[in-house]
Design a protein with these regions (language model features):
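Gly-Asp-aromatic-enriched flexible segments
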Residues: 1-110
Length: 110
């Protein structure tokens, strides 16, 4: 999905479950409370398994969770990802992920 950067837009997790690590169980968009992502994750410092977004291939990742405001002033493709170990530094990385989330993007603000 392309975002224009001028309007207030927010992403809302409408359902589903996923996991960055099958041993820790399935979660929604907020991820695993108490499991904080380390360096090398999509967004270090946020919950492991949380819904993360970025705008464009070189955009800075931002937390969406169950509901999050998209940053204004950025144009490009909205990309979504689970907050996981991208390089397999701490485990299997993205290869053991399971599940999916349904996400709606709409105009509005938090």
């Amino acid at each position: 999905m392309q975002v224009n950067g001028y309007s207030w837009q927010l992403a809302v997790c409408r359902g589903g479950q996923w996991t960055a690590n099958p041993a820790t169980g399935m979660v929604g968009g907020d991820g695993h409370a108490g499991l904080i992502a380390k360096p090398g994750y999509t967004l270090p410092g946020a919950n492991e398994g949380a819904l993360i977004g970025r705008i464009g291939s070189n955009g800075t990742p931002f937390l969406i969770g169950a509901m999050g405001q998209l940053p204004r002033g950025q144009q490009g493709e909205l990309q979504l990802c689970i907050n996981d170990d991208l390089d397999g530094r701490y485990g299997a990385g993205l290869s053991d992920n399971q599940g999916s989330l349904s996400v709606e993007v709409r105009f509005g603000s938090l």
